């Protein structure tokens, strides 16, 4: 029997001298949230990241995920692929609400969905991820105040939840293959595992 895939709270914390603050680095399948004045950073290829924050309290977080490349109808909200995407978003939103964020104050900035991984589906996996995150946030009535989606370049995203500031650096030359390998490994794990449990928003 396959083990379940669960979104993991990022554990890679360090001090960033350039920005003079504590920083959390998140990898595919991870998320992080905080009420502190700190930085959350990730590098995206085909994956997407939603930076969600309470614009009043400054409680915010970021996730990093992609939809599994499963068979069936990828647009069907009941498909395993769509259920995993909803799960990845709900884990972050629930953690923000538990930390004291108010649903009516949530706003989002979304990034990624680049055309970086090839050969997963007939539809570009990055486009699928980007469309999913837009549709999910619209359905949840969470306003998207900024986005940088699709394109062919990976991105490095710096998110300061306390202020809502985001810096995006497009990586025109990605000379190492770490990012692509990391996303391919993540996609393989998603495809060979089932989603853990159901998550309900409260």
UniProtKB/Swiss-Prot annotation:
Protein name (record): Probable chemoreceptor glutamine deamidase CheD
Source organism (scientific name): Thiobacillus denitrificans (strain ATCC 25259 / T1)
Record key words, sorted: Chemotaxis, Hydrolase
Alphabetical list of Gene3D superfamilies matching this protein: 3.30.1330.200
Entry annotated with the keyword Cell membrane: no
Described purpose of this protein according to its UniProt entry: Probably deamidates glutamine residues to glutamate on methyl-accepting chemotaxis receptors (MCPs), playing an important role in chemotaxis.
One GO MF term: protein-glutamine glutaminase activity
Protein family according to the UniProt entry: Belongs to the CheD family.
């Amino acid at each position: 029997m396959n083990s379940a895939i669960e979104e993991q709270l990022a554990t890679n914390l360090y001090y960033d001298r350039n920005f003079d603050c504590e920083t959390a680095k998140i990898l595919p399948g991870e998320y992080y949230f905080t009420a502190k004045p700190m930085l959350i950073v990730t590098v995206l290829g085909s994956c997407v990241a939603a930076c969600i924050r309470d614009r009043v309290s400054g409680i915010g977080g970021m996730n990093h995920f992609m939809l599994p490349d499963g068979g069936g109808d990828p647009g069907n909200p009941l498909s395993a692929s769509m259920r995993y995407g909803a799960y990845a978003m709900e884990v972050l939103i629930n953690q923000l609400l538990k930390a004291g964020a108010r649903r009516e104050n949530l706003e989002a900035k979304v990034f990624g969905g680049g055309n970086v991984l090839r050969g997963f589906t007939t539809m570009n996996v990055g486009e699928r991820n980007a469309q999913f995150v837009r549709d999910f946030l619209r359905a949840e009535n969470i306003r998207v105040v900024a986005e940088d989606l699709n394109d062919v370049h990976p991105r490095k995203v710096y998110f300061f939840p306390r202020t809502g500031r985001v810096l995006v650096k497009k990586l025109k030359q990605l000379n190492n293959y770490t990012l692509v390998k990391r996303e391919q490994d993540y996609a393989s794990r998603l495809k060979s595992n089932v989603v853990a449990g159901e998550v309900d928003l409260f």
